[in-house]
Amino acid sequence: MAVKGFRPTTPTRREMTMCTFEEITTSTPEKSLLVSLKKSGGRNANGKITVRHIGGGAKRKYRIIDFKRNKDNIPAKVVSIEYDPNRTAFIALVVYADGEKRYIIAPVGLKVGDTVVSGPESDIKVGNCLPIRNIPVGTVIHNIELAAGKGAQLVRSAGNSAQLMAKEGDYSQVRLPSGEVRYIRVECRATIGVVSNQTNEIVNIGKAGRKRHMGVRPTVRGSVMNPNDHPHGGGEGRSPIGHPSPRTPWGKPALGYKTRKNKKYSDRFIVKRRHDK
């Protein structure tokens, strides 16, 4: 997929880029797979802001995605490649031989008319989903389960892929996009290929209005707030933050402070951390 620029009719338009969406084949989603979404504005049931910078944005319908791929040994034909406003990857509408329709995450190279299959006996072909036990070492995969039958949880965003590094007994070693190598049980399923929309990471949003359409509100610097609103706030004019290191709005150290629990149960499944050389 290509990225297009714009004539500099305004200063923000000069830097702005956008995907050309060449792979998209239809603009009308499948009605039976849509669910209404209610906006929260980042507020909880008490009306208090629990997540900042959320609000507004274009109306969306949620597309029900099949992350389990549990309809085994029944071929499904790709009918369309569609845009999904709820994720960075494109989605594919597939119709099974028995007539059932489902959405799946579209991998790179999947085209209208292609056939995808799930199940242990599936071929090693882009878009097919099978247990890691049946995938050859070295294969590039995405949509990886952490618990068998729960549905894919890892490597689902645009342009991402993982690689199967080794298999030994009940566990496999998978290198994730971050560089982390992790144990994953061989019964867990994964899909062959790389997630679509690879150019997403080089798109320049360019202007605030596009972020507002996405439902993202402005981020105010702590140094321009009052001292009762942020640890960096207060002072006369442009004052120092008044701390040895930057702080979050709630007073905890920011920028590099480790927030992961040091005795997390999943530590035993991490073979190599993403920062290790």
UniProtKB/Swiss-Prot annotation:
InterPro entries: NA-bd_OB-fold, Rib_uL2_dom2, Ribosomal_uL2, Ribosomal_uL2_bac/org-type, Ribosomal_uL2_C, Ribosomal_uL2_CS, Ribosomal_uL2_dom3, Ribosomal_uL2_RNA-bd_dom. The keyword Cytoplasm does not apply. Belongs to the universal ribosomal protein uL2 family. One of the primary rRNA binding proteins. Required for association of the 30S and 50S subunits to form the 70S ribosome, for tRNA binding and peptide bond formation. It has been suggested to have peptidyltransferase activity; this is somewhat controversial. Makes several contacts with the 16S rRNA in the 70S ribosome. Residues 219-277 are annotated as: Disordered. This is Large ribosomal subunit protein uL2. NCBIfam families: rplB_bact. Part of the 50S ribosomal subunit. Forms a bridge to the 30S subunit in the 70S ribosome. The keyword Ribonucleoprotein applies. One of its GO terms (cellular component) is large ribosomal subunit. Keywords: Ribonucleoprotein, Ribosomal protein, RNA-binding, rRNA-binding. It comes from Clostridium botulinum (strain 657 / Type Ba4). GO terms for molecular function: rRNA binding; structural constituent of ribosome; transferase activity. GO terms for biological process: cytoplasmic translation.
